[in-house]
Every structure is written in C-alpha cells, then in structure tokens.
Regions:
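Mature catalytic core of soluble alpha/beta enzymes
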Residues: 1-334
Length: 334
C-alpha cells in the first residue's frame, strides 16, 4: 500500500469503515504534531506515523518500537538460526517447545486460517519454501518433482499439535518430526498489530503503523481525517485508484508483483496456476488480514473469490489480465 495525502482526486474510489470510534474522536488533539519514525525489521522496513501527545518522549517510544520488533524476530524468524522458530524446526521428534505469548498467538491464528481456508494458508511449509529457495538457503536450480514431494510429505499444518495455554501454563507446540514452520505469511501483520498495541498502551491513540507494506490505522489524524492509504495496482494495469480510510482497520497485500514475492500453493507445492496477480484484504486485525491475503493469493482466482465471499472478507483481487473483483464486504464500504 501507499500512504496517501488528504487531498482526494475526483476519479478516486473511497472505502470507509462502517463505524467511527467515538472514543478515538473524543481523544483527538488538533494541535498534536504528526511525527514519523522508521527502522529495519524482518528483512524489510517499518514505519510509524503518530499524532504525538504533548510531553511524549519520542526517542524512548521509537526505541521501544524497535525493541518490540527485535523481540519478535528473535522468536519467529526463519532467517535467524538462533530464533525460537529455528530451534523448534530442528527439535527432536515428539519434543514439546514452550511458546511465548506472541508466538502462541500467531500459531493459533495461523491454524485457524489454515482450517478455514482448507489449507490454502499453511504455516508449516518451511521444508517446501526451503527447497524453492524462499528462505536463507539458495538452491542452484528449481526443485524437481521428487524433491517437492518429499518436502510436502514432511510439511502440513495438520501435523501440528498445539497445547494451548492455561492458568499459569504456557502454550506449547509438539514437533512431529522434521517439520519446519515458516510464518512469513502472517508475521509482519502480527508485528504491525503489536506495535499499534504498544503505542496504545503508551497513551498514543492515533497512529498509522506499517511493517513491510502491511498497515494498521488507529484513531485518526489530528486534522480529523482518517489515515488514508492507496491500494497498490501492479505495473501495467490501469484501474481507478482505490483509497482506504484506515480507522481502527488494517490492510495487507499479497501478490507476485511485489519485489521478491513467490507464492506457492500449499496443496500442490508449486506456484499456483490462475492465481490473482494482487490481493488486498481489509480486517480489524492486521495479522488476520496478512494470513487471509496469503491464502487468497495461493489459489486460483475463482477459488479465492469463493473463499473471500464465504468468509465475509473485505478483499480486492486483481487478475493478470487487469480484471478486478471486489468482494461484497469491500463493495459495501465504497
């Protein structure tokens, strides 16, 4: 997505949420300065735009944001050999790994979307993404069918056994043997949610958070406008711009037009045939928007349309020929 200015061209389409949070409006300070922070995380960039309350320590808050993101990388990155995720991936058959709250929340959401999407989203494809060179390792050639079959046999969300947290007991995840997690289809969305939550707990009710293109809008700008973002359109495709008011709302994108993107259908182990070139999903949770955008981008576009409509998702799909489909939930926001 692209962070947009407040001015609205005549040809643009506008999508707005159904409700305005009256509490957020009541806490609005028209004199608050808008401050931008940014940094690096998860192999990409993060950016925060905040309406900074009087007396706030901007440097300390920015440091807290970076520390929060660094903590999630230490838990869930498949690029960091010392991360908890990598330790789980190489754990012994039948062993249980205790999950911190962030990791547990991501796994629970990932398993929910995996089930609801009939496996179109799968957090347990690390073996498959590895043989395709979508992780730290860079194979010299694409995998052959036998290699893909072996990776698929060692993968799959249905092999995961999650023991959820109870009173005074951490959640834990069983290693079924040789299974590798890859949370890249959901982690950036969760990170954006986590930063927005950190800011809210610090008394910042109005902020726009972006992590690698996944965005959360909390509250609104000091001038009373929402946080505007424009949904991206792949190069060479001409469509009327679609601008979204991110007020207590998040947006995530997926597609092969994104730099470095390479989507796999978890059910076949191959690049999906007939999938959308670009997918955008709006949701109150950026983590859920991220996971659903990943799911919709991994299947043929007709299946993605049916899935988005069935789940009531506010989604836009763009076909490779330039055709556009807006889900009923997104159309209702225009």
């Amino acid at each position: 997505v692209t962070i947009a200015a407040s001015t609205v061209p005549a040809s643009i389409r506008i999508a707005v949420p159904e409700r305005i949070d009256e509490m957020a409006l009541a806490r609005l300070d028209p004199s608050a300065p808008v401050v931008d922070w940014e940094g690096a995380t998860m192999g990409t960039r993060w950016r925060v735009r905040v309406a900074l309350p009087t007396g706030s320590d901007a440097a300390a808050l920015m440091a807290r944001v970076q520390a929060r993101l660094d903590g999630m990388v230490a838990e869930m990155s498949h690029w960091e050999p010392s991360s908890l995720l990598c330790r789980y991936n190489h754990a012994a058959l039948g062993s249980w790994t205790a999950l911190p709250p962030d990791f547990a929340a991501v796994i629970e959401a990932a398993l929910l979307v995996a089930e609801r999407s009939a496996g179109a989203f799968d957090p347990a494809l690390g073996r498959l993404t590895d043989v395709w060179g979508l992780g730290p390792r860079r194979p010299d050639a694409p995998p052959d069918e036998a290699t893909i079959a072996r990776a698929l046999a060692a993968s799959g969300w249905r092999r995961l056994a999650l023991d959820r947290a109870g009173q005074g007991v951490s959640a834990r995840l069983r290693q079924p043997g040789g299974l590798w997690l890859d949370l890249s289809g959901v982690a950036k969305g969760y990170a954006a949610d986590a930063v927005a939550d950190l800011l809210a707990r610090a008394g910042i009710a109005h902020a726009l958070v972006e992590v690698g293109g996944e965005c959360v809008g909390a509250g609104m700008r000091p001038d009373g406008d929402p946080w505007w973002v424009d949904l991206e359109t792949p190069a060479g495709i001409a469509l009327p711009p679609l601008r979204v008011a991110l007020h207590q709302l998040a947006v995530a994108t997926s597609g092969d037009y994104l730099r470095g993107a390479h989507t796999l259908d978890p059910r076949t182990g191959h690049v999906p045939i007939g999938a959308a070139s670009a997918v955008s999903v709006l949701h109150p949770s950026c983590m859920m928007a991220d996971a659903w955008a990943s799911a919709l981008g991994a299947v043929p576009i007709a299946e993605a349309r049916d899935l988005a409509a069935r789940e009531g998702l506010a989604a836009r799909l763009i076909a490779r020929d330039g055709g556009e489909w807006l889900s009923p939930a997104l159309s209702a926001m225009l």
